[in-house]
Every structure is written in C-alpha cells, then in structure tokens.
Design a protein with these regions (language model features):
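Bergerat-fold GHKL ATPase/HATPase_c domain
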Residues: 1-45, 150-158
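Conserved ATP-binding N-box helix of the HATPase_c
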Residues: 37-62
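Conserved beta-strand-loop-beta-strand hairpin that lines the nucleotide-binding pocket
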Residues: 1-9, 55-158
C-alpha cells in the first residue's frame, strides 16, 4: 500500500458542538485535492455522522473523552479515520437489531431509531471499514475521479 503524501491529525472533545470544525477541515482538504462539489458534500456528511456517533455513543460519563480524526491524502484518494476510546459496538449485531426498513410493513412515523448514520456513511463513501476492539474506529475512503490533485500545491511534506 502506498504512503500518503500528507497526513493531518486532529483531536476534538467528544461533544457535538465541535463536529462543525471537522466538517470544515474535511471540506478544505477535499477541495484542495480536487474533489467535486457533490463529493465534498458527501465527505462532509460522512465525517459528520462518524464524529456525531462518537460524540453521542462512545462515552457514558459526564467527563467525555475525545475523538481523533486523521486525514491521509494520497494522489488518488482521501482516507479519513475517526476513532474513539469509548464504548464499542458490534456492527453485525446492530444491523440485526435494527434490520432493514420496509415501507410496506412500517409507517415512517414508527421507523426504528438508530443506524441511519452508519447507512449514510456506507452509501456516501467508496470504502468503509469499522473496527470495534478498543472503542470504535471508522476508516472511510473516497477516490478521486482521475488525477485531480492540485499540481504545484505547497504541502507540508517535501
């Protein structure tokens, strides 16, 4: 696997009011890399959902922990990692619990809560991996259409 040409890492308190900072960062990075407007919007929604899930579900105490966000910039893709050290969950068990929504059998007013954010992340990103050994780590990948990387852009790495 190739090495990223730049890596950016941020840590935020696991509080919903900081998710906007991560959205803006994702938008700025994706724009610089050459993603389209629609792709940037997809990235913003996916990273927001992952961070919001961590802020709402990872830590049970009032002294909330933190969420780490890593952006790996490659020539052909952007990988975003959102990780917490809070309560883990089993994705397969959650999917069994919430099950698919069937509009023929269920009214929208009584739709089960939970899982929509995970569905959005998987739908909007090209690749998604969940790890739940220590806390939860979400690895999301969005590929560029062709070579849209800004040529001659100044980066941190040589």
């Amino acid at each position: 696997m190739s090495q990223p040409y730049d890596y950016i890492e941020m840590k935020i308190p696991a509080k919903p009011e900081y998710v906007g900072v991560i959205r803006l960062t994702a938008s700025g990075i994706a724009g610089r890399m050459g993603f389209s407007y629609d792709e940037i919007e997809d990235l913003k929604i996916a990273v927001s959902e992952a961070c919001t899930n961590a802020a709402q579900h990872a830590y049970k105490s009032k002294d909330k922990g933190e969420v780490s966000i890593g952006y790996s910039l490659y020539k052909d893709r952007l990988e975003i990692i959102v990780a917490d050290r809070g309560v883990s969950f089993d994705l397969q068990e959650l999917r069994k619990k919430i099950g698919p929504y069937d509009q023929q059998k269920e009214s929208i007013e009584y739709m089960r809560e939970g899982g929509l954010g995970l569905y959005l992340i998987e739908t909007l990103m090209d690749e998604v991996k969940f790890h739940h050994n220590e806390g939860v780590t979400v690895l999301m990948t969005k590929y560029l259409e062709g070579e849209k990387v800004e040529s001659g852009a100044k980066t941190i790495s040589p």
